């Protein structure tokens, strides 16, 4: 009898502890192929946070849509809230990027994504108007080493009077990498590049994008929230009457895991 009571008490204690540490989590999206989709990234309207939309393509690869083009996602780091997309390649035997028709990479400024300050942009086939810009278009610019050592950029050796480099991070390039006739016709990008290294030791081309910390999950009623951890209430910062599952007293919102936790 004593043993039975002890086991019952132990089971009850475990249930209470489980209840006390329970968290209210957002619905995570299923993997895209072999790639995990972390919160708040969303591949369908019913998972993640739809404001952070990306796509799982028919070939089971993740894709990031800009205003007028799409780019493959190469890697995701949920802890730093960043992912890396693959820049557009050059048209064969030319010094023109395939996305020049779209004027390069242009993010939607109303969405919670922006270009990080970790990217070095190599601009190719540029006009002399760039000499009036803060870009490094000098003879010492790393773009010359890139052109001379990169087979796919060999057509750039005789194209355009200039090539230039710059590091992202300014307000003018937080949402776009522009490619156009009046500026530069081609580009590449490298994350955390040390330009002093030989080109064969540069990382693979990539452009790092970061997302803003997500707010609490959207709700229509209390049924959409876990009452043990959160309460559906109006978002005072929204002019659209949006409601969210705000964490109950003693719990805080974890924007990386998408949960209310201690």
Language-model segments: what does each one mean?
Residues 2-262:
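Typically disulfide-stabilized, N-glycosylated extracellular/lumenal ectodomains of secreted
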């Amino acid at each position: 009898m004593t043993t039975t009571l002890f086991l019952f008490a132990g089971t009850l204690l475990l249930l209470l502890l489980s209840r006390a540490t329970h968290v209210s989590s957002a619905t995570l999206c299923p993997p895209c192929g072999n790639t995990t989709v972390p919160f708040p990234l969303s591949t369908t309207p019913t998972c993640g946070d739809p404001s952070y939309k990306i796509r799982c393509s028919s070939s089971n690869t993740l894709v990031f849509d800009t205003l007028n083009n799409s780019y493959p996602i190469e890697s995701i780091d949920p802890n730093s809230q960043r992912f890396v997309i693959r820049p557009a390649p050059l048209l064969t035997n030319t010094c023109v990027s395939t996305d020049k028709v779209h004027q390069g990479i242009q993010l939607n400024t109303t969405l919670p994504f922006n270009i990080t300050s970790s990217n070095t942009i190599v601009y190719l086939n540029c006009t002399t108007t760039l000499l009036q810009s803060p870009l490094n278009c000098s003879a010492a610019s790393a773009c010359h080493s890139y052109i001379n050592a990169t087979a796919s950029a060999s057509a750039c050796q005789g194209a355009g009077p200039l090539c230039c480099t710059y590091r992202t991070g300014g307000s003018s390039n937080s949402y776009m990498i522009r490619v156009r006739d009046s500026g530069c016709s081609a580009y590449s990008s490298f994350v955390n590049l040390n330009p002093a290294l030989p080109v064969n030791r540069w990382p693979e081309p990539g452009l790092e994008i970061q997302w803003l910390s997500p707010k609490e999950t959207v709700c229509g009623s209390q049924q959409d929230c876990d009452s043990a951890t959160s309460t559906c209430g109006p978002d005072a910062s929204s002019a659209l009457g949006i409601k969210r599952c705000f964490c109950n007293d003693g719990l805080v919102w974890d924007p990386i895991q998408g949960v209310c936790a201690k």
